[in-house]
UniProtKB/Swiss-Prot annotation:
Signal sequence range: none
Protein name: UPF0758 protein PSHAa2643
Annotated Pfam families: RadC, UPF0758_N
The keyword Disulfide bond is annotated on this UniProt entry: no
Record InterPro entries: MPN (IPR037518), RadC_JAB (IPR025657), RuvA_2-like (IPR010994), UPF0758 (IPR001405), UPF0758_CS (IPR020891), UPF0758_N (IPR046778)
Biological source species: Pseudoalteromonas translucida (strain TAC 125)
PANTHER family: DNA REPAIR PROTEIN RADC, UPF0758 PROTEIN YEES-RELATED
CDD domains linked: MPN_DUF2466 (cd08071)
């Protein structure tokens, strides 16, 4: 069925204007993004087909460019548009979280870090600088690559924490493999950093490893 054959109340764009975005299904929202269908398949049917093929929005949105463009009705232009929309959404959420963030529980930190590190293909080491009330001053990626004593420099971490007037810090890094278990190298570098920061009266509250949708807290495991 052609989209133009549907009453206005069933056309995604008109439905959104009338009822708001929350009233639309996943397929209808995706159809607005896609804009056009294919011969013999209107845009809503195409959107539903893509959702069925990918099983979840997460799978569709996190597909590589090659995987994305290989799918029916998609191409480089759509991939670029989607990545731009996702990045804008993430920056908006980061802005909201950063403005309101008070890290008084591991779960609050998990939510923030999962948003920050979702989809990263490279291992990174991030520091959250906190004030005396555990409010976020700033987050910063200090190091890239495998986290060990050769790639994470305590002197640089201390320097950055002092520069940001931090009363406390939380370390975080990701495991792109999706396995969040801490390695022996993770434990050793955390201990070195904790000792270095103690010399300037800055508390290390936690070190959190993000692996996919899972997080592991050193503090909860008694490692800090």
């Amino acid at each position: 069925m052609q989209l133009t054959s549907l009453p206005n109340s069933q056309r995604p764009r008109e439905k959104l204007i009338e009822k708001g975005a929350k009233a639309l299904s996943d397929a209808e929202l995706l159809a607005i993004f896609l804009r056009t269908g294919l011969p013999g398949m209107n845009v809503i049917e195409l959107a539903q087909h893509l959702l069925n093929e990918n099983k979840t929005l997460h799978n569709l949105f996190n597909a590589s460019m090659e995987e994305f463009c290989a799918q029916k009705g998609l191409g480089t232009a759509k991939y670029v548009q989607l990545q731009a929309v996702l990045e804008l959404s993430q920056r908006y959420m980061q802005e909201r979280c950063q403005r309101d963030a008070i890290f008084n529980s591991p779960n609050a930190v998990y939510d923030y870090l999962t948003l920050q590190m979702r989809g990263l293909q490279q291992e990174v080491f991030m520091v959250l600088y906190l004030d005396s009330q555990n409010r976020l001053i700033k987050d910063e990626i200090l190091f890239y690559g495998t986290i060990n004593s050769a790639s994470v420099y305590p002197r640089e971490v201390v320097k950055a924490a002092l520069k940001n007037n931090a009363a406390a810090v939380i370390f975080a890094h990701n495991h792109p493999s999706g396995i969040a278990e801490p390695s022996q190298a993770d434990k050793l570098i955390t201990n070195k950093l904790q000792q270095a920061l103690q010399l300037v009266d800055i508390n290390v509250l936690d070190h959190i490893i993000v692996g996919g949708e899972t997080c592991v807290s050193f503090a909860e495991r008694g490692l800090i």
